[in-house]
Amino acid sequence: MTEKIRVGIVGYGNLGRGAELAIQQQPDMELVAVFSRRGKVDTVDPNVTSVHIDEAKNYQDKIDVMILCGGSATDLPEQTPAFASMFNTVDSFDTHAKIPEHFAKVDEAAKKSGKISVISVGWDPGLFSINRVMSEAVLIDGNTYTFWGKGLSQGHSDAVRRVEGVKGGVQYTIPSEEAMDRVRRGENPVLSTSEKHKRECYVVLEDGADPKKVEETIKTMPNYFDEYDTTVHFITEEELKRDHNAMPHGGFVI
């Protein structure tokens, strides 16, 4: 291929770094620039250009597609429609209840600009969706159950960190072993959200933050924690760095 696909990355957290590494493995792609609210960032490849997100509009003739690596809680609802008005885009928006609303906003922006936007192609929705489609195409009689974890949810961890008074934090999704056993036994149970998973949060507070207010805000957060059995643990910054710096995850489609 003589002409490579020119790619930009918006947002440079764990997902943004992963996108950079993935692009490095693709012979038909080149990373033009990383765009971040922080401006200059330390990219995996020090030769990659990184600029402030506000400068993205100046790259419309230099980039073929933008990979949007922000969080679903507050970033992508604003960023994807905005970037779809200037670029072809891809995002991994995963707030399931709000996908129709997100689609409508992005679709409107992309149609006005004549661009193409692909939304919600991450883990779930995304790879797990493909697993479900393949399984249901073969096993047409039955129910499909998805269990996430045990592992660290980057999206829910990001949502925790956006809460006022939170300095740092992570969230672990824990599937119910009892619920999975019932499914594996062929009972075809009807399971509520809270019966399938629990959520555990480990939070570092800002100085002077009210722990009760923070806990209540997390537990009642719509689309993230309000329907789950959620436990909030308050820990020190040292404990967060020592005990929660890995990002394991997994899951089951049954």
Task: Identify the role of each PLM range.
Residues 12:
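Glycine-rich Rossmann-fold phosphate-binding loop(s) that bind the pyrophosphate
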Residues 105, 127-143, 158-172:
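Oxidoreductase and adenylate-handling cofactor-binding alpha/beta cores
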